[in-house]
């Protein structure tokens, strides 16, 4: 009766194997390194300073979203969904990069720490470009109606 009466999952799917595969990808590893480095940088900030609290919260959010969206993109075969995740990743990576300039200007973090993070983000950007280039467009599938990644007409 319903389209979802039959299970649509793969009985051979192994979530542990999928997790190991994801964790072995260079882009996910670099995203995790950025998240860890961001956490360490945030720990050096003055917890009693309201500006530091705001900046650290935003930095942590950006750094946590990046690996989560990589996992989301890796979990699907759909080109449009992969590209949507890629855009979100780019936005948060750039936000994190921009925040390093703010922190330097506000003198909230040692410039050497910020340069380390900037270097890691640049290494991530290079991996990101290769990763996105590996996405396979399925020309037999219709677009999503928005025309952003696939011409719908």
Question: Where in the sequence are the language-model features?
Answer:
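Amphipathic alpha-helical assembly/interaction segments
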Residues: 1-153
């Amino acid at each position: 009766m319903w389209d979802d009466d039959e299970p649509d999952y793969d009985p051979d799917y192994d979530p542990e194997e999928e997790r190991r595969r994801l964790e072995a990808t260079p882009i996910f590893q670099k995203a995790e390194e950025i998240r860890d480095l961001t956490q360490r940088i945030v720990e050096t900030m003055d917890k009693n300073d309201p500006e530091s609290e705001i900046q650290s919260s935003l930095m942590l959010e950006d750094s946590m979203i990046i690996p989560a969206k990589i996992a989301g993109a890796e979990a699907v075969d759909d080109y449009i969904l992969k590209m949507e995740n890629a855009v979100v990743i780019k936005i948060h990576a750039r936000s994190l990069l921009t925040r390093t300039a703010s922190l330097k200007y506000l003198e909230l973090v040692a410039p050497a720490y910020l340069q380390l993070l900037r270097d890691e983000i640049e290494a991530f950007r290079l991996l990101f470009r290769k990763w996105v280039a590996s996405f396979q467009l399925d020309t037999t599938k219709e677009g999503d109606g928005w025309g952003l990644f696939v011409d719908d007409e």
